[in-house]
């Protein structure tokens, strides 16, 4: 193992740097540095050689040119035992450790007020060059791009004076992952800007990078391998930010279903709400005066399907609700923004139940993209975050205030049901859910069947449809079940026929002007 004798340190994020640099100084490592990093180290009593003194060439062009010099890159790229003679001939001392992180380009362009000039000035040139050079020559050079690695590198240096081959290789791979992401972010930004000026909504090339959070026993089915990857900077509370408090390891299906349940319940903030999901579809959703009441009412919609389901809440999980769940049913996952200590103790009686806490979320989620893999390609779209374009009554009868509240409730639920989606509801509780049918009228039939099977009365309820009714048969079916009001996007060639059917049955019907297909 080759000892670390000389290090180059130049960082934008100085988290943890002083402690790491002190370890190097204590081992007698010579430290080369630039600009603000050099000042920080010197101000804290560490001996530093400015890169400009090392190269005999000043920093220039407002810091654009600092480390781009043969005496720096030769010291990094020189192969020990192979290039020693040429390094000696040209007076190039070897550099054994490179510690660099980059200008914060992604954080800069995330600011809506960022202009092109500011973005350009936050494109790091020297940093990626140093990192890539050191990573390429990892056989001789240790490279650190992540402050989280300072501790393990410091421990190896303190114990042996150098860094093991396995660690150097891992750190080198990490560098290329990091620079790939960095260059991808720049390419995405500039390409999107160029395409926007040309009238396009998306960049002509799209570079994405996710970090592996978890390797899984298997995927959707036991014969499929799987892993869970997350964004580097998750902007909003969700399944990717969740902390598992107890329970078995989350499976592929657990994560997919928990995401569906949580994203659905996040729509509701005006009262305690509960969403129960099975196979990515809500099988019960309800409001309540308390969290326990919300759970009880959601469970009533479809107790049979709730078995082995995922339960999500929009309020802190309390002990009373937690006790009710574990005493009543088998549940795979419970997730809430927060979980009280008493609720944790209650769920602990069922050690296999996966209990998650995701943190509070914003009532105004930021824009994001949705992706769907197809063979040989990727479908990209804006996430479906809006609810309605407008609410317009199209029938002779206007919905009552109570009906309108239920219509808007079921409309929010229908948005998360697989198409064709029909949701029956009353008093802000789902009565029946018809999901994933090829025929919309069959979804309506299934919603009525589910309600009857659960012992719930459809008469006097309302209905939401995620897309327009192509024929009047869906309205006739709903009327036969006792539905009194309907919410749907409208836009069918036969809207007049559908409206006439609603009028014949004395129904109120509103159009939203916005479809919510979910595939």
From Swiss-Prot:
Annotated pathway: Purine metabolism; IMP biosynthesis via de novo pathway; 5-formamido-1-(5-phospho-D-ribosyl)imidazole-4-carboxamide from 5-amino-1-(5-phospho-D-ribosyl)imidazole-4-carboxamide (10-formyl THF route): step 1/1; Purine metabolism; IMP biosynthesis via de novo pathway; IMP from 5-formamido-1-(5-phospho-D-ribosyl)imidazole-4-carboxamide: step 1/1
Domain of life, per lineage: Bacteria
EC number: 2.1.2.3, 3.5.4.10
Listed GO biological process terms: 'de novo' IMP biosynthetic process
Catalytic activity as recorded in UniProt: (6R)-10-formyltetrahydrofolate + 5-amino-1-(5-phospho-beta-D-ribosyl)imidazole-4-carboxamide = 5-formamido-1-(5-phospho-D-ribosyl)imidazole-4-carboxamide + (6S)-5,6,7,8-tetrahydrofolate; IMP + H2O = 5-formamido-1-(5-phospho-D-ribosyl)imidazole-4-carboxamide
GO molecular function: IMP cyclohydrolase activity; phosphoribosylaminoimidazolecarboxamide formyltransferase activity
Annotated MGS-like domain residues: 1-145
Keywords tagged on the record: Hydrolase, Multifunctional enzyme, Purine biosynthesis, Transferase
UniProt-listed PROSITE patterns: MGS
GO cellular component: cytosol
Family per record: Belongs to the PurH family.
UniProt free text on domains: The IMP cyclohydrolase activity resides in the N-terminal region.
Protein name, UniProt field: Bifunctional purine biosynthesis protein PurH
Natural source organism: Allochromatium vinosum (strain ATCC 17899 / DSM 180 / NBRC 103801 / NCIMB 10441 / D)
